[in-house]
Structure formats: structure tokens, C-alpha cells
């Protein structure tokens, strides 16, 4: 009986195999699938790119601030500590916010700046003044682009909080305005100045990691305690309305600098996906007392990007759930590895460590992180020149541990010395385009999407990312 059953099952198996159609060889071959593409407008006649744009030196950088709610006042405070500056004007829709910021300036022993408030268009009067060089914009996201364009059109440089633009149309408008007016348009991305990031960038530029092949970044920040404090629930409303990675810049900015994006390489294609929205609708019900079955932004969004030179980037976004804060910041190179969260660590091939300057190198292997003492010695040895100058002062003044102060200081330093800024309008474009492009990918079944060349052909004009310094 057992023999008969065995013969029966073998017969069934052979029959099934005989009935299967062999997989054609051609189906296993690699095929090229055209990604979704968005239009790239032609550069208007007479315009040129603003890569490494320089403008005349400013003895004193005269600044006007727009938006004095959550982030603006701390920026005003930081600027009272930066030499070679004058705070000329302050603007907020609410008069009390402008008045509080004015007291920050006068309490620092400086002349009281002019105030603009009480009207939706009061900020335009600030931009129209002839005694301002730079407009510093820290409003809600939806007003960033309009204000930046108006400032440049009225002869001012524009520094815009993250994200500076939320759509491709806004991005191209900022690019064209900067190119047309020859004014700087910089996104205020602070995380590129954090201590581990800038030190690691210096190591990478010195070749310590070999060829950097893969980088990661994220914005993972449980905003539970902050949701009630966004004016008129603007941030929750934005997440309710838009799908995709709407806040990619903190993770993507440092990653792009490591890969020399639009300075020898460019982001070419991305694929994005998200989870369903669970926490968002609950927050709307909690704070706005209404149901939100239409809530668009998934609790967790992830994006994978491939560059022209065959490098890869992984970005995540999650502001909804109880996870430890993380910007990930990770790089993988042919000779080394770096990781910031949850702990700062480096890993190298043994021959990458100089035994004359780094202790205990015999204990290193390519399979484990270097000991803490070795990590500290490396970070000291490769401390970035910017941190060598500013670390002590930055940590004293503060602003997310000091990186905000360094960001503002470097902006002023470059303007006063007539140097290219550390971040240009194309950085702004590349880091902000994730909002529109990831949405497009997700809404089309996680389809590949081509990342536009915002430089319009000049992405390899500069050989590698670098910071400018006065001679």
C-alpha cells in the first residue's frame, strides 16, 4: 500500500512538472523600464546658473526677519551674537510676536528694529525697504516660496526655513528668480552643520572611507508634544492634505553632501512607499474634533534613490509614532562605515587607521566599530575647520546644540566675504523635491520616478562639495 501511494504521488509530481510551461530565457534578462518623468522647463533666455554664485562683499549684513512664532525668535537671538550684522526689521502677523522679538534685540543692547504686523501682506513692506540685504523667512511652510521670491525680486538675498518649497512649481520659481536676479536663495538646513555630520564629511573628503557608495538619512521625530503649538494646526493640516515625504531635508541634506550631489553626481531615480495613515487621523480627531478618513500622509514613508554614478540613498520620514529621535545619518564606503543613531560609531578596515596617531589600532577589525577612545581621537584629528573656529561659541549660544548658530554664522561669513554660500538654490531644490516626487511614486504604485536635473545640465560643473573660506 505504501509503495502504491508513493508511486501515485510521484506520478502526480511528474505530471505537474510536465504540464508546467518553461520560463522563457528572455524573461530573466534585465530590462530597462522608463521611470515616470516630470517636465524640466527650459532656462529663460539671458539666465545663467548660480552654481558657486558670488556677490559683492557686505561690511554689515542688514537683515529682516519674517515669521516670529516658533522658530523665528530663537533665530533673532542667535543673530544678536554674530558680528557684522544689524537687525533692521521684524515681521509677524501677530503684533505681540513682533514686539517680543524686538525686546530680544533691545535687551542685547542693540537698536530697536522696525516692526511690521497686523496684516497678511505686512511682510511685503519689510521686503520693499532699501536698507535690508537679507530676508530671513521662518513662517509656516506654505508661505516660504512666495516670500522668498518677493524678497529676491526686491533686491534681497533670501534665507528660507525648511522646507523652502513644497512643489516642483515652487522650486522652479525659486530657481528662476535666483538666476534672474543673481541673488542668493539658501535653505536654512541646520543639520549639515552638526558635529558628527561635519566631522564625518571631512573624513570622507580626506578619503578615510574610500569611495562612499551608500548613505542614509531620516526625520524620525515623535511630534506628539508639539502638535498643539503649530499656529492654526498648519503642520497637521499639511500632513492631512499631502502624501509622501513632506520633510526630507534634515536627513537628505547631509547625505547629498557626502555624495557631491550636483557637484559631480546627481540624483537620478527614486522609488517611494508608505504605510497607511493611522496616527494622523487620530490626531485630527483629538485636536480638531473631527473625523479624517481622507488623511493622506502615511505614518511611515521611505524613499530609495539611485544616483547617476551608481550610488544609493535611503531616506525615512515618521513624525507620528513613539520612536527615539533619529536622523539616521549613515554611510557605507569601500574602506569604512559611519553611523550616528542610535550611537555614534565608525568602522574601518585595519589598514585605514594610522598607527602613529591612533591608539590601540591592533584591536580594530572590519567587523566591529572602533573603540570609543579611537572614535574620539578620530573626531579630534578630523575636526572640521568650521568647528575648530566655532564649536565652543556655538555650544554656548545654542540652537539645536549649536548647529543653528553655525548655520547663521556661516551665512553671514560668506555674505561679508563675497563667497559662495555653503548651500545654493539647487541644494534647496534637490532636498525639497522629495515632497512632490515621492507622492508621485506612491500614488502610482511605488513606481520609479526620474529626479529632474535642477541645474539644467551643469550638475558636474564643480568637482566635489566644499566650503568656501576667505584667503
From Swiss-Prot:
InterPro entries: Gfo/Idh/MocA-like_OxRdtase_N, Gfo/Idh/MocA_oxidrdct_glycsds, Glyco_hydro_109_C, NAD(P)-bd_dom_sf. Residues 1-15 form the signal peptide. GO terms for molecular function: hydrolase activity, acting on glycosyl bonds; nucleotide binding. A lipid is attached at residue 16 (S-diacylglycerol cysteine). It is found in: Cell membrane. NAD(+) binds at residues 70-71, 92, 141-144, 161-162, 190, 247. Substrate binds at residues 219, 235, 247-250, 325. It is an enzyme of class 3 (hydrolase). Pfam families: GFO_IDH_MocA (PF01408), Glyco_hydro_109_C (PF21252). Its main location: membrane. A lipid is attached at residue 16 (N-palmitoyl cysteine). Keywords: Cell membrane, Glycosidase, Hydrolase, Lipoprotein, Membrane, NAD, Palmitate, Signal. GO terms for cellular component: plasma membrane. Its cofactor is NAD(+). It is a lipid-anchor. Binds 1 NAD(+) per subunit. The NAD(+) cannot dissociate. Its EC number is 3.2.1.-. It comes from the Bacteria. PANTHER family: BCDNA.GH03377, GLYCOSYL HYDROLASE FAMILY 109 PROTEIN. Glycosidase. Belongs to the Gfo/Idh/MocA family. Glycosyl hydrolase 109 subfamily. This is Glycosyl hydrolase family 109 protein 1. It comes from Phocaeicola vulgatus (strain ATCC 8482 / DSM 1447 / JCM 5826 / CCUG 4940 / NBRC 14291 / NCTC 11154) (Bacteroides vulgatus).
Amino acid at each position: 500500500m505504501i509503495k502504491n501511494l508513493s508511486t501515485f504521488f510521484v506520478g502526480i509530481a511528474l505530471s505537474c512538472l510536465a504540464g508546467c510551461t518553461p520560463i522563457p530565457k528572455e524573461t530573466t534578462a534585465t530590462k530597462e523600464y522608463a521611470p515616470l518623468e516630470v517636465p524640466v522647463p527650459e532656462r529663460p533666455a539671458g539666465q545663467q546658473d548660480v552654481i558657486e554664485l558670488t556677490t559683492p562683499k557686505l561690511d554689515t549684513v542688514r537683515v529682516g526677519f519674517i515669521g516670529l512664532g516658533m522658530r523665528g525668535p530663537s533665530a533673532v537671538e542667535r543673530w544678536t551674537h554674530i558680528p557684522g550684522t544689524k537687525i533692521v526689521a521684524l515681521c509677524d502677523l501677530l503684533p505681540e510676536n513682533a514686539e517680543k522679538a524686538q525686546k530680544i534685540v533691545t535687551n542685547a543692547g542693540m537698536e530697536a528694529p522696525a516692526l511690521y504686523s497686523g496684516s497678511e501682506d505686512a511682510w511685503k513692506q519689510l521686503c520693499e525697504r532699501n536698507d535690508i540685504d537679507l530676508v530671513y523667512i521662518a513662517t509656516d511652510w506654505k508661505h516660504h516660496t512666495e516670500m522668498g521670491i518677493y524678497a529676491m525680486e526686491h533686491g534681497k538675498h533670501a534665507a528660507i526655513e525648511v522646507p523652502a518649497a513644497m512643489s516642483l512649481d515652487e522650486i522652479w520659481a525659486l530657481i528662476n528668480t535666483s538666476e534672474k536676479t543673481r541673488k542668493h536663495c539658501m535653505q536654512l538646513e541646520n543639520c549639515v552643520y552638526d558635529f558628527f555630520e561635519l566631522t564625518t564629511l571631512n573624513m570622507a573628503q580626506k578619503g578615510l572611507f574610500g569611495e562612499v557608495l551608500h548613505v542614509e538619512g531620516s526625520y524620525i521625530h515623535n511630534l506628539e508634544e508639539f502638535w498643539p503649538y503649530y499656529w492654526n494646526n498648519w503642520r497637521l493640516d499639511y500632513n492631512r492634505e499631502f502624501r509622501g515625504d513632506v520633510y526630507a531635508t534634515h536627513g537628505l541634506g547631509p547625505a547629498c553632501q557626502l555624495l557631491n550631489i550636483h557637484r559631480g553626481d546627481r540624483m537620478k531615480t527614486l522609488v517611494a512607499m508608505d504605510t497607511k495613515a493611522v496616527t494622523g487621523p487620530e490626531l485630527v480627531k483629538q485636536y480638531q474634533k473631527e473625523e479624517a478618513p481622507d488623511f493622506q500622509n502615511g505614518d511611515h514613508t521611505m524613499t530609495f534613490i539611485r544616483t547617476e554614478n551608481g550610488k544609493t540613498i535611503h531616506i525615512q520620514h515618521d513624525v507620528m509614532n513613539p520612536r527615539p529621535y533619529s536622523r539616521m545619518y549613515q554611510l557605507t564606503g569601500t574602506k569604512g562605515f559611519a553611523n550616528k543613531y542610535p550611537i555614534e560609531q565608525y568602522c574601518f578596515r585595519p589598514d585605514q587607521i594610522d598607527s602613529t596617531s591612533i591608539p590601540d589600532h591592533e584591536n580594530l577589525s572590519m567587523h566591529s566599530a572602533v573603540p570609543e577612545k579611537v572614535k574620539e581621537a578620530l573626531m579630534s584629528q578630523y575636526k572640521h575647520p568650521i568647528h575648530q573656529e566655532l564649536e565652543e561659541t556655538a555650544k554656548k549660544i545654542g540652537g539645536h546644540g549649536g548647529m543653528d548658530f553655525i548655520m547663521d554664522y556661516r551665512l553671514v561669513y560668506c555674505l561679508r566675504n563675497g563667497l559662495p554660500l555653503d548651500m545654493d538654490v539647487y541644494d534647496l531644490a534637490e532636498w525639497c523635491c522629495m515632497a512632490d516626487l515621492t507622492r508621485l511614486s506612491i500614488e502610482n504604485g511605488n513606481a520609479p520616478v526620474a529626479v529632474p536635473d535642477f541645474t539644467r545640465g551643469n550638475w558636474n560643473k564643480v568637482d566635489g562639495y566644499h566650503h568656501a573660506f576667505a584667503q
